[in-house]
Amino acid sequence: MNDSQYHQLIDDLLINLEEMLDDVEADIDYESASSILTLIFVNGSKIIINKQPPLHQLWVATKFNGHHFNYQDGLWIDERTGVEFWQFMNDAASKQAEVPVSFPRPTE
């Protein structure tokens, strides 16, 4: 993947996630600036999602841990746990929102 493809993939992912946030039942606020998306939960906790261009990775920081995702076979996969990004976000957001949260993986 070249730099242009990488940036387009991340930009699309962030836009998809922003659009989904408007439809979730949990009260999750968000801020978006300079390719950083911050999800803000009622309890004050945050999930921060950002690009890591030199490594072509997507980084996610939760109140529990940091995660680095690599693009493999059309999916963003956590390099440590092997979990796919959207499944990870469902689990992480549900924990931090303290209610079930579901982000369906977008279709291409």
Curated annotation (Swiss-Prot):
Superkingdom per UniProt: Bacteria
GO MF entries: ferric iron binding; ferrous iron binding
Any one GO biological process: iron-sulfur cluster assembly
Keyword Metal-binding: yes
Recorded family membership: Belongs to the frataxin family.
Keyword terms, alphabetized: Iron, Metal-binding
The organism of origin for this protein: Pseudoalteromonas atlantica (strain T6c / ATCC BAA-1087)
Protein name as it appears in the record: Iron-sulfur cluster assembly protein CyaY
Annotated function: Involved in iron-sulfur (Fe-S) cluster assembly. May act as a regulator of Fe-S biogenesis.
